[in-house]
UniProtKB/Swiss-Prot annotation:
Changing Y319F: Abrogates the ability to bind GRB2 and its capacity to signal and enhance cytotoxicity. It comes from Mus musculus (Mouse). Residues 296-310 have a biased composition (Polar residues). Residues 287-316 are annotated as: Disordered. Disulfide bonds join C37-C109, C153-C224, C180-C200. It is a single-pass type I membrane protein. The keyword Disulfide bond applies. This is CD226 antigen.
């Protein structure tokens, strides 16, 4: 009995640690990075605070209360500012001046609301290149504004899937839209401002993400990550394109670019063929000139007025004219 209690305690601690290390958004480190934090509900907000988890301790960055002035810690006083601290302070996104590697870590944006209670968003800042480069598209989907868009991801069949995560990938950040633990059939509540829906049922062979009433801002890359308990994972990336009244520049541009590249290759091949033909002709002309000169020399040696005699002329009789002398009788003596 004591062993079972001890095992349950370990599992509880492990679950708590996993929940603590989970973050809602991953942001690429840059000098002027912005950590987005917008409260999505309409409850009465009383206070908001920003903190950073260094791994060993939690450091306070700023605290804002509508009944008091904004308080920013001395270490961050001239390094951060709030983009929108208007009345209601629902958008408390934190922007940095000249951020450096020292700012890498996990940040917490905590809203205190009444009567709903605390609402927290965790943001992880990492050193990385553009996230879109690391997530090339596997499929394309086009839709019109106002439609309910359904993204589908086929799950692996060769190994058991424990968790499925849907993310929206942007160049500067990656947001978790939905997360489902298939073994426990538990869902993750997304802190992303855009509300989405997804399925979460054990034994399902595919995962879907529904984006209601799609708009132009929903265009972009969506990644479906399947993870096993052993750490094995697989990703599937879909590029969603919300058309603007029927024309889609984002979809047309790659096609036009491909056609232009194809025409350019064809033009280069044609120029190469024509160049080779011209070069061959230039090589043949000097070879013909000696033959022409020989024929001209042979022609000049012949008399222009003497025609070529035929074989019949060679067989004709030849007559010679001899002079005739008169025979006078010798005088008789």
């Amino acid at each position: 009995m004591a062993y079972v209690t001890w095992l349950l305690a370990i599992l509880h601690v492990h679950k708590a640690l996993c929940e603590e290390t989970l973050w809602d958004t991953t942001v690429r480190l840059s000098e002027t990075m912005t950590l987005e934090c917008v409260y999505p509900l309409t409850h009465n907000l009383t206070q908001v605070e920003w903190t950073k988890n260094t791994g060993t301790k939690t450091v306070s960055i700023a605290v804002y209360n509508p009944n008091h002035n904004m308080h920013i810690e001395s270490n961050y006083l001239h390094r951060v500012h709030f983009l929108n601290s208007t009345v209601g302070f629902r958008n408390m996104s934190l922007s940095f001046y000249n951020a450096s590697e020292a700012d890498i870590g996990i940040y917490s944006c905590l809203f205190h609301a009444f009567p709903n209670g605390p609402w927290e968003k965790k943001i992880k800042v990492v050193w990385s290149d553009s996230f879109e480069i690391a997530a090339p598209s596997d499929s394309y989907l086009s839709a019109e504004p106002g439609q309910d868009v359904t993204l589908t991801c086929q799950l692996p069949r060769t190994w058991p899937v424990q968790q499925v995560i849907w993310e929206k990938v942007q160049p500067h950040q990656v947001d978790i839209l939905a997360s489902c633990n298939l073994s426990q059939e538990t869902r993750y509540t997304s802190k992303y401002l855009r509300q989405t829906r997804s399925n979460c049922s054990q034994g399902s062979m595919k995962s879907i993400l529904i984006i209601p009433n799609a708009m132009a801002a929903d265009s972009g890359l969506y990644r479906c990550r399947s993870e096993a308990i052993t750490g094995k994972n697989k990703s599937f990336v879909i590029r969603l394109i919300i058309t603007d009244g029927g024309t889609n520049k984002h979809f047309i541009l790659p096609i036009v670019g491909g056609l232009v590249s194809l025409l350019l290759v064809i033009l280069i091949i044609i120029i190469f063929i024509l160049y080779n033909r011209k070069r061959r002709r230039q090589v043949r002309i000097p070879l013909k000139e000696p033959r022409d000169k020989q024929s001209k020399v042979a022609t000049n040696c012949r008399s222009p007025t003497s025609p070529i005699q035929s074989t019949d002329d060679e067989k004709e009789d030849i007559y010679v004219n001899y002079p005739t002398f008169s025979r006078r009788p010798k005088p008789r003596l």
